[in-house]
Amino acid sequence: MIIVLSPAKSLDYDTPPRTKTHTLPDFIERSAELIDVLRKLSPAQIGTLMHISDPLAALNATRYADWSPEFTAENSKQAALAFDGDVYGGLDANSLAVDDLQFAQKHLRILSGLYGVLRPLDWMQPYRLEMGTRLANPRGKDLYAFWGDDVTLALNELFKQDDDAVLVNLASEEYFKVVRPKVLKARIVTPVFEDWKNGQYKIISFYAKRARGLMARYAIEHRITDPRKLKAFDVDGYAFAAADSDDERWVFRRKLT
């Protein structure tokens, strides 16, 4: 069983990493290709492409200029410790034990516009490049064309020793589109998190993102390798709604008082 998460736009490179243990991303050469494309853009072009403010565009232009194919403790941080958004508030990797992180290293992957796919302890240099960005590149019109089957094939490598290969999709729709189901040698299960609001259950973005991180942490702490055990997930008041779920879409619901 492998869990995939989306990355986060916000990053924390100020807090020192709680472990020195690290690995290197699998697709550094491919990332360098994208950096070459991004370095040709002015801050104004970056702002227009990514729909971000002038200060953010300038920051990311600097990040692309500073990016190096040589990853060091000075310019990099482990991915799961560097990402700092709603999902990662739920995951809270900084409070995971060392053996938890090692389990995550085997069973958790983070999809990335720049890096393709990351292990939790892969060193990562700061960047912003959302998977849905329409960045023309030598391989096509956008990042889905750039990554092609590569991310899916990398995931397939993880399933070679797995009798019942299951990919648990805790990523956003934008990011999961880089995974090609027809190429993937695994069954896909997508947990969906709904909250009660205005007389009905609905997906509320902030809560749903945090819940994805909470479920990833739950799987790590409980050493879950059989996805069926995820149905017992009950963190923060969520409960599996069997009647509204099917084999591929698992619904978890809660009512906040």
Swiss-Prot record:
Q: Which domain of life is it from?
A: Bacteria
Listed under GO biological process in this entry are: response to hydroperoxide
Disulfide bonding pattern of the chain: none
Which Gene Ontology cellular component terms are annotated?
cytosol
NCBIfam families reported for this sequence:
PRK02101.1-1, PRK02101.1-3
Q: Which family does it belong to?
A: Belongs to the UPF0246 family.
Q: HAMAP family of this UniProt entry?
A: UPF0246 (MF_00652)
Sorted alphabetically, which PANTHER family does this protein's record hold?
Answer: PEROXIDE STRESS RESISTANCE PROTEIN YAAA, PEROXIDE STRESS RESPONSE PROTEIN YAAA
Q: Report what the protein is called.
A: UPF0246 protein Rpic_2164
Q: From which organism does this entry originate?
A: Ralstonia pickettii (strain 12J)
